[in-house]
């Protein structure tokens, strides 16, 4: 069993952690891993390890959409959040993660990133991975290929501008999740040719449906107990998710689950050290 360690929430540590990950990038399974830094709160859930994802080996992951997923051990989870940033709720999700010294991945909508660049910088400054989720959240399987890719690129450019002050369609973190998990083969092939990992999910909380935080907690924990591990999808723009998150993290801690933080391989992971 991997020793569970937490994370110290400083940009200096984030930079050191990125250097450690990059230095470990060559492995036989296409990922690199390192233990996380020590957490000031000894009883926190923490982050057990960092997994560096190579797009050549893992171009598409998440069993809900693809035949392959990340190489996670039993009771290992990757926490991912879509559709932010939305300051009223994203800030509460970030606070819950910080309380437990947990790092996650946020797939941002470019329009929201443009509207809330300070929140984007906060996500990165607190050590989380920033991925991409289009600019306007369209149904990409129902629009022309050129229009879909333009929306992908516009979203990446908006996220990069919010993070680094530079508009570019070359993502500093080449992680993308299609809105509604809807894509065409041509879109998937193009992103693969650009070295961008496409993320699905292994399970989700269905937090787009109307339910109480308590109902959501019951639903996602039952699904996790059935699957035993996996990439979990939440939405940080949902008030019910923000309200449920402290209890969910406590459930993970009390039931022996371990959080894995995903980062890109072969990059400087600039978005983990944005001030």
Task: Enumerate the predicted regions with their spans.
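Catalytic grooves of carbohydrate-active enzymes
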Residues: 225-263
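Alpha-helical scaffold elements lining the catalytic groove of polysaccharide deacetylases
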Residues: 89, 138-165, 182-228, 243-244
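Structural recognition of the beta-strand scaffold that forms the well-ordered cores
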Residues: 77-80, 104-108, 129-132, 174-178, ...
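Acidic (Asp/Glu)-rich catalytic clusters
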Residues: 93-99, 113-131, 191-193, 223-225
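Extracytoplasmic
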Residues: 72-76, 101, 125, 135, ...
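Short helix-terminating capping/connector loops at secondary-structure junctions
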Residues: 166-172
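N-terminal pre-catalytic segment of deacetylase/amide-hydrolase enzymes
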Residues: 2-80, 86-99, 215, 249-251, ...
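Solvent-exposed loop/turn segments at secondary-structure junctions
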Residues: 83-87, 111-114, 129-130, 136-140, ...
